[in-house]
Amino acid sequence: MASLTSLIFVSIVTAAHGQTVVSIPLGHNYTLIGPPITSEVIWTKLGSVDYFDIICNKTKPIIVTCNIQNLTLINVSKVYSGYYYGYDRYSSQYRNYLVRVTQLKTTKMPNMAKIRSDDNSLETFTSPTTPDEKNIPDSMIAIVAAVAVVMALIIICMLLYACRYKKFHPKKQDLLLRLNI
């Protein structure tokens, strides 16, 4: 079990190293470029039902086309999100991709009445005023009091330690603890 967990962890770390992050709009096609090849690139998708799912020969749940080097994702949907790993069978060349599927965002023209009202509000803008000394927030007073109490406790602990150290170790002469108490 530990070896399987370590294999998965090493695989994910290897896949995350040197990866290219790709954002693909929903419903579009996208081609992942494979590594330089000497024979044929094998494409796998990490994180699917099988940990290493070879995807060039499958049609479900994602539809892809593979040539010797590249992988084309067809009609991208949310299922396509994940890590894609392409490696050459006979060399150590590989490419990692993190595919993120995004929604296309439509932009609306702003309302001109809203823009005019925003212009008017800019004209009446005043700079913020600093708080009066009489209006100090309670939270600030509590924070300052807490810091003062903690500093006092630290000083008391240091003095108690110095006194106890001198009492139990009278023969040791520590330059920092030469207190005539």
Swiss-Prot record:
Cross-referenced InterPro entries: Adeno_E3_CR1, Adeno_E3_CR2
Covalent S-S links between cysteines: none
Sorted UniProt keywords: Early protein, Glycoprotein
Entry-listed glycosylation sites: N29, N57, N70, N75
Function of the protein: E3 proteins seem to be dispensable for virus growth in tissue culture cells. They are potentially important for virus growth under special conditions; E3 region may help adenoviruses to evade the immune surveillance of the host.
Family statement: Belongs to the adenoviridae E3_20 family.
Record-given protein name: Early E3 20.3 kDa glycoprotein
Taxonomic source organism: Human adenovirus B serotype 35 (HAdV-35)
